[in-house]
């Protein structure tokens, strides 16, 4: 079996968020556990680190037509951890300082989607399955049906679309379908059963309709996006395609995120860390010193490492933070960037309170230090497709405090439940500041009960969020899709 994974990001080449983490690790895990010939294609951004780019192997140049345009592009390859990565290089679209945020994103990623299909003869690689990720590559599915399905080597291909965050759908003006892809079918642009989305068109919706299967990054999120509350306007479509919708929990790279070997942290350690030296505690004391927090082993240190946006629960946090700092003996460290009013407010509180450090930036090395140093990790998201922060925190022995939503619900088992069982964290249900406040205070209370707390830490060490289980589920889905009757695909029956 041959699989081509298409993505806008893949670590360590290009990463701006969780998408890059997933696509840098999942294909490697699949390769390790199967005989599948899995390869990855992504844009050849100029921002790719030079230590990789200097080792790229040129394959050839190719002209990619995009409507009336003819873009000369170069295709290169690089073998990373036994997986071939292809890079589509184009000076006009990808020679930019950043990956996202440009006015011509429809054209930029429309080009990438078209190029994915056009370079296959050059590579002499025709996959059985193209595994697409988010809106940046979702147009491959309708393009395959309308422009390539009649061609030899393309007519048996299947597509899977993974939704990493339904909020981002690639919404553009309808004319782009004709302008970039020569798709003149009126219903594609104007029929709500197709790509039309409130007078615009949605690249992601094209993938949701025409892909043979849809996955998302946790079982709970797969259910949530079929509801009006979290379906982002396509809940009806997702409900209709529920038999083709799979929730597969993301993992993290245990080779990369490993407190025993992480070169970024102050002192490497094993969990549970109960010895006389208590290496994890040394990380805490060193971080407090570096961030100019009062140095204390007794005071619980709560970390927040995320984007400073409403989705991540900043409205709840900023509402209760002054009360917590006044009423509890606790320290907070924030690391991230986002909406200016959150950045400014946290900076203001940090000047006012000695027990709060606001690091308004993103620094991977500092993030690792904070994971290793913190006692608790706060993630009270409004919605959360999967979440990587709580998984990394658990790996480093930081006890999560989360809202029970999406992947947070699937990964954090409460330490106190109605049955009295002890799990790995603290959870709350409603998106409510006072409910979160109560849960944080409860966690602080249990932090000081050392025997109970040590039991939670011991429980953390039994959790495995490595990619092996997720990879097995994707392998199973690939095989299921390959053996599905090509002449009766679900996408066709849905549109009739």
UniProtKB/Swiss-Prot annotation:
UniProt KW keywords: Glycogen biosynthesis, Glycosyltransferase, Transferase
Pathways per UniProt: Glycan biosynthesis; glycogen biosynthesis
Signal sequence residues: none
Coiled-coil annotated residue ranges, if any: none
Gene3D superfamilies: Glycogen Phosphorylase B
Binding site for ADP-alpha-D-glucose: 15
SUPFAM superfamilies per the UniProt record, alphabetical: UDP-Glycosyltransferase/glycogen phosphorylase
EC number: 2.4.1.21
CDD domains referenced in this protein's UniProt entry, alphabetically: GT5_Glycogen_synthase_DULL1-like
Enzymatic reactions: [(1->4)-alpha-D-glucosyl](n) + ADP-alpha-D-glucose = [(1->4)-alpha-D-glucosyl](n+1) + ADP + H(+)
GO term, biological process aspect, one: glycogen biosynthetic process
GO molecular function: alpha-1,4-glucan glucosyltransferase (ADP-glucose donor) activity; alpha-1,4-glucan glucosyltransferase (UDP-glucose donor) activity
Source domain of life: Bacteria
Pfam families per UniProt: Glyco_transf_5, Glycos_transf_1
InterPro entries: Glyco_trans_1, GS/SS, Starch_synth_cat_dom
Family, similarity comment: Belongs to the glycosyltransferase 1 family. Bacterial/plant glycogen synthase subfamily.
Purpose: Synthesizes alpha-1,4-glucan chains using ADP-glucose.
NCBIfam families to which the protein is assigned, alphabetical: glgA, PRK00654.1-1
Record-given protein name: Glycogen synthase
Gene source species: Natranaerobius thermophilus (strain ATCC BAA-1301 / DSM 18059 / JW/NM-WN-LF)
């Amino acid at each position: 079996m041959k699989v081509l994974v298409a993505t806008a990001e893949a670590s360590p080449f290009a990463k701006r968020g969780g998408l890059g983490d997933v696509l840098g690790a999942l294909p490697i895990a699949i390769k390790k556990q199967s005989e599948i010939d899995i390869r990855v294609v992504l844009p050849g951004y100029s921002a790719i680190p030079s230590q990789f780019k200097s080792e790229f192997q040129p394959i050839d140049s190719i002209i990619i037509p995009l409507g009336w345009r003819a873009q000369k592009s170069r295709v290169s390859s690089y073998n990373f951890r036994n997986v071939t990565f292809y890079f589509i290089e184009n000076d006009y679209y990808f020679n930019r300082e950043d990956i996202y945020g440009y006015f011509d994103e429809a054209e930029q990623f429309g080009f990438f989607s078209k190029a994915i299909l056009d370079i296959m003869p050059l590579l002499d690689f025709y996959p059985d399955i193209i595994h697409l990720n988010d809106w940046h590559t979702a147009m491959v599915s309708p393009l395959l049906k309308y422009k390539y399905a009649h061609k030899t080597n393309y007519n048996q291909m299947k597509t899977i679309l993974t939704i990493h965050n339904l909020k981002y759908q690639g919404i553009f003006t309808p004319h782009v379908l004709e302008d970039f892809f020569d798709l003149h079918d009126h219903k594609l642009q104007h029929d709500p059963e197709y790509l039309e989305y409130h007078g615009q068109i949605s690249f992601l919706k094209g993938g949701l309709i025409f892909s043979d299967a849809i996955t998302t990054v946790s079982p709970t999120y797969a259910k949530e996006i079929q509801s009006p509350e979290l379906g982002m306007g396509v809940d009806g479509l997702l409900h209709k395609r529920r038999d083709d919708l799979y929730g597969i929990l993301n993992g993290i790279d245990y080779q990369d995120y490993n407190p025993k070997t992480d070169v970024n942290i102050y002192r490497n350690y094993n969990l549970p860390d109960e010895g006389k030296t208590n290496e994890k505690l040394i990380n805490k004391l060193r971080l407090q010193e570096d961030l100019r927090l009062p140095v204390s082993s007794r005071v619980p240190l709560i970390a927040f490492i995320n984007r400073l946006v409403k989705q991540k629960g900043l409205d709840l946090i900023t509402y209760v933070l002054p009360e917590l700092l006044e009423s509890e003996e606790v320290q907070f460290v924030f690391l991230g960037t986002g909406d200016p009013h959150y950045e400014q407010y946290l900076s203001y509180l940090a000047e006012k309170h000695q027990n709060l450090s606001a690091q308004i930036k993103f620094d991977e090395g500092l993030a690792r230090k904070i994971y290793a140093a913190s006692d608790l990790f706060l993630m009270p998201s409004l919605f959360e497709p999967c979440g990587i922060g709580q998984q990394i925190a658990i790996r480093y022995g930081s006890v999560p405090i989360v809202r029970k939503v999406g992947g947070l619900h699937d990964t954090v088992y409460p330490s106190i439940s109605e049955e009295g069982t002890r799990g790995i964290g603290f959870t709350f249900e409603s998106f409510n500041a006072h409910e979160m406040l109560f849960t944080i205070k409860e966690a602080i209370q249990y932090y000081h009960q050392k025997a109970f707390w040590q039991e939670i830490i011991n429980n953390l060490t039994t959790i495995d969020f490595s990619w092996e289980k997720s990879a097995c589920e994707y392998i199973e889905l690939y095989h299921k899709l390959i053996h599905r009757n090509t002449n009766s695909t679900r996408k066709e029956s849905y549109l009739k």
